[in-house]
From Swiss-Prot:
The formation of the proteasomal ATPase PAN-20S proteasome complex, via the docking of the C-termini of PAN into the intersubunit pockets in the alpha-rings, triggers opening of the gate for substrate entry. Interconversion between the open-gate and close-gate conformations leads to a dynamic regulation of the 20S proteasome proteolysis activity. This is Proteasome subunit beta 2. Residues 1-10 form a propeptide. It comes from Pyrococcus furiosus (strain ATCC 43587 / DSM 3638 / JCM 8422 / Vc1). GO terms for cellular component: cytoplasm; proteasome core complex, beta-subunit complex.
Length: 206
């Protein structure tokens, strides 16, 4: 079995709260130790129309949690008649992770969404939860934070948030060998969830 730190290598995820919504961004490289084993892995997952999570860590563990969270969100909506709040989803994830801390899911998560306003939470591997205006996770997080700390501003537009998130990921790509290949950016506003990648993302950055 790979050492825990080795399994957690790879990826950089970023989240920002903007005036009109939340921006999540991630690279698409997946690594196993020092080996690149996939170049087009999706690391941001839609949970509901106004909820998403970005995961850095073991791909299988993250996908297992995504399936569980989607099922819980669907059950909540069918029972209560409305979408789960961002805080409720983050708290549910934190409780699941804390309950399995002796046999942990190997991942660090950013939970973003829009209910009454845009919100972003960071949830660590054992269920520690923090709400903030911006956050990063993964092997390139130090490089991403160097950009976010200096350039993030409150009330920035979603378009500016996309540009800043991409800049933070690109700095990580240049400096962290476990971050690379493609980019996926997600925005969540009152109008819902939208993905940007490839040519569409390039157009947004002009």
């Amino acid at each position: 079995m790979l050492h825990l730190k080795e399994k957690l290598k790879g990826t950089t995820t970023v989240g920002l709260v903007c005036k009109e919504g939340v921006v999540l961004a991630a690279d698409t490289r997946a690594s196993l130790g020092n080996i690149i084993y996939a170049k087009n892995v999706t690391k941001i997952h839609k949970i509901d129309e106004h909820l998403a999570i970005a995961g850095a860590g073991d791909v299988g563990d993250i996908l297992n949690l995504v399936r569980l969270l989607k099922a819980e969100a669907n059950l909540y909506k069918s029972t209560v008649g409305k979408e789960m709040s961002v805080k409720a989803l983050a708290t549910l994830l934190a409780n699941i992770l804390n309950g399995s801390k002796y046999f942990p899911y190997l991942g660090w998560f950013l939970v973003g969404g829009y209910d009454e306003k845009p919100r972003l939470f960071s949830v660590d591997m054992v269920g520690g939860i923090t709400e903030d205006n911006y956050a990063a996770a993964g092997s390139g997080m130090e490089f991403a934070y160097s950009i976010l700390d200096s350039e993030y501003r409150e009330e920035m537009s979603v378009n500016d948030g996309i540009k800043l998130a991409v800049k933070a990921i690109n700095v990580a790509i240049k400096r962290d060998v476990f971050t690379g290949d493609g980019l996926l950016v997600v925005t969540i506003t009152k109008d819902g969830y939208k993905e940007y990648r490839g040519a569409e993302l390039e157009k947004m950055l002009k």
